[in-house]
Amino acid sequence: MIIFDEKKYAEDLIKNGYKDKTRIVLDNIILVKYWKYSGLSESEIKKKLEDFMIDFKHRYNSNIIPYHIRKALNQGLRYPLVFDKVVNITQKEIDIINSIDVLELRKVLFVLLVIWKFRDKQKFMISNNNLKKLAKVKCKNSVFWDYLHRLHDLGCLKAFVYKCKPYYKLNIEECGDIVLNIKNYDDIISYYLSMIYPDEYIYCSICGIPIKQTSNRRKYCSSCWKERERELRVTINKRYYEKNKIKTV
């Protein structure tokens, strides 16, 4: 699982708690980074994390809290919180992707490229299911493995094992003019599809992310529409409250 906005992710964690017990170590590191970004001291962060873990101790063995706290502090205090990161894609990179004859392959490679550059061109891990979801590719696992093998054979993708875990790196020439600035990672593949099918896409009136045009009325992406609906509900509720308050006076 790739976390593109650690700030937003940490705020959701604080509000709703752990969602996956297999990610508690990584979640704690992000929480430490978030509280460090918020200006808290190391002792304050330690206390906050301890309280947080106690609140959700039903999700794991509570005897390991001290170990988890030490590990999270050791990692989280060393690195900055990652959010509002922009990935630039060049025309040369798009040309290389477009030289592949199968659209599904191109979609997978584009998403891999974005992740690789988001990771500052370091090796990265991602499950096939997550990669398929981000690339919006629907196929059997055997077919998807064939896609990855073909990208490897084309020289674009390098897969290797490090500490018994599979990692990826890319081999794509970066030169040329920048043609895409990716700022929103809710729908990565829409950036690429909007370039090859420009007549089918418009841009969200709020955040600017490309969105597939399904009707003449559509102006917002899903995330911005949800936020706009929330603001409208708040406004309506406020007016209703004020109206009834006047009646009772």
Task: Say what each PLM segment does.
Residues 196-249:
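BZIP DNA-binding basic region
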Residues 1-101, 122, 130-140, 144-190:
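Modules that initiate DNA replication and primer synthesis
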Residues 81-86, 124, 213-220:
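Short, exposed beta-strand "edge-strand" segments with a Pro/Gly-rich flavor and a Y/T-containing core
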Residues 99-133, 210:
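Short helix->loop/beta-hairpin flanking segments within DNA-binding domains
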Residues 188-193, 210:
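Short, cationic low-complexity segments
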